[in-house]
Design a protein with these regions (language model features):
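N-terminal anchoring/stem segment of glycosyltransferases
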Residues: 1-64, 84-86, 255-268
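Conserved glycosyltransferase catalytic-site signature
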Residues: 16-19, 69-72, 76, 154, ...
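A conserved donor-nucleotide-binding helix/loop in the catalytic core
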Residues: 21, 62-91, 101
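The conserved acidic donor/metal-binding loop of glycosyltransferases
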Residues: 94-98
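Conserved donor-nucleotide/metal-binding helix-loop-beta segment in metal-dependent transferases, i.e.
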Residues: 99-135
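Short, flexible, basic/aromatic active-site loop/helix in glycosyltransferases
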Residues: 133-148
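Catalytic core and acceptor-binding pocket of nucleotide-sugar-dependent glycosyltransferases
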Residues: 146-233
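C-terminal catalytic/acceptor-binding lobe
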Residues: 207-268
Length: 268
C-alpha cells in the first residue's frame, strides 16, 4: 500500500488550511483500499475526526529539527520514521500543493523504479559551500562538486523501505551543514538530491499532476482561494466546486488588490 504523508507542526492556521486543501484534492484521487493518508503532527488531536492515520510527532520535533536549529530537517527524518514504521512505500507531499487528476496513477507507476521528487531545480545549487567536505555513514567521504552537484525540489519525496540508507546519509549531510541553515534553508532538499546522485538512484519528477505553489505571490493568491472555497468548519472536507487554477494574470491582479487594500487598511 502506498502511504501519502503530510506534515503539520507549529500550529499555524494558514499552513493547516493549505494542508486541508491539498489533502481534499488528494482524496479525490484515491481508492482507500489501495492507499493510506498519514498526517504527522505535534497536535494530533486536531485531526482526530479526519479519515486519516495520525502520527504524533510532538516527542520528536526537537530532536528531528536538530535541537530547533533547522526545522526543515523534520521532513527527511519523518519520511525515515514512516518508512520504518509501516514498511511500505511513502510519498511525502508539501502542504502548499494541489493534486490533479492522474497523480495517484503517475506516482504509483514511477515509484516502482525510482525515488520521486517534484522537479529538477539547478546544477551547482549552493556555490558558497565550494570545498565543503564531510563523511557520510554509508557513502563515506563526500565533497561538494561545482561541476556535478545538483538539487531537486523536495515538494514531493517518494521512497520505499530499501531507501532508508539514503535518508541516513541525507540526515548526516544536513547535520554537517546545519550551522549554515539560516543562510541556505534549502540544504534539506540539496542533501537528499546529492545522495541520490552519488548512489546513482533513479529520480522521477512529478509536476504536471502535482502543483506546488510555494512561491510568495502564488501562496498569497491561494490563501484567498482557500478562504473563499472551503468550509470554515475544520472537519468539513467537502471539495470546492472548482479547483484553483494558477492563471498568471489572476495571480497578478489579486496580489495588486491585496497590496493596495493592505496599504489603505493601514491608514484606517
Amino acid at each position: 500500500m502506498l502511504n501519502y504523508l503530510y506534515l503539520d507542526y507549529g500550529g499555524k492556521a494558514k499552513y493547516r488550511a493549505e494542508l486541508k486543501y491539498s489533502l481534499i484534492s488528494l482524496q479525490a484521487e484515491l481508492d482507500p483500499a489501495r492507499a493510506r493518508i498519514l498526517v504527522a503532527s505535534d497536535a494530533p488531536e486536531v485531526y482526530r475526526n479526519w479519515p486519516v492515520t495520525v502520527m504524533d510527532i510532538a516527542p520528536h520535533v526537537r530532536d528531528w529539527s536538530g535541537g530547533g536549529l533547522y526545522y526543515h530537517r523534520i521532513k527527511p527524518a519523518l519520511v525515515r520514521e514512516a518508512l520504518s514504521r509501516f514498511s511500505e512505500p511513502v510519498l511525502f507531499l508539501d502542504s502548499d500543493s494541489i493534486v490533479r487528476p492522474g497523480f495517484h496513477a503517475e506516482a504509483t507507476e514511477k515509484m516502482t523504479a525510482a525515488v520521486v521528487m517534484n522537479r529538477f531545480e539547478k546544477q551547482n545549487p549552493i556555490p558558497p559551500i565550494r570545498g565543503f567536505r564531510t563523511r557520510l555513514p554509508h557513502l563515506g567521504e563526500y565533497r561538494y562538486d561545482v561541476a556535478h552537484s545538483w538539487m531537486y525540489n523536495s515538494g514531493l519525496i517518494g521512497m520505499a523501505p530499501q531507501h532508508l540508507p539514503l535518508l541516513d546519509d541525507s540526515l548526516a549531510m544536513i547535520d554537517a551543514l546545519i550551522g549554515r541553515a539560516k543562510k541556505f534553508p534549502m540544504i534539506e532538499q540539496f542533501a537528499l538530491s546529492e545522495v541520490l546522485r552519488l548512489t546513482q538512484t533513479p529520480i522521477a519528477e512529478i509536476h504536471d499532476s502535482f502543483l506546488h505553489y510555494w512561491q510568495g505571490r502564488r501562496r498569497i493568491y491561494m490563501a484567498n482561494q482557500i478562504r473563499k472555497t472551503l468550509s470554515p468548519e475544520w472537519d468539513d472536507l467537502t471539495p470546492p466546486k472548482e479547483w484553483a487554477q494558477m492563471h498568471y494574470w489572476k495571480i497578478r491582479a489579486y496580489n495588486y488588490y491585496h497590496g493596495v487594500t493592505r496599504v489603505l487598511g493601514a491608514f484606517q
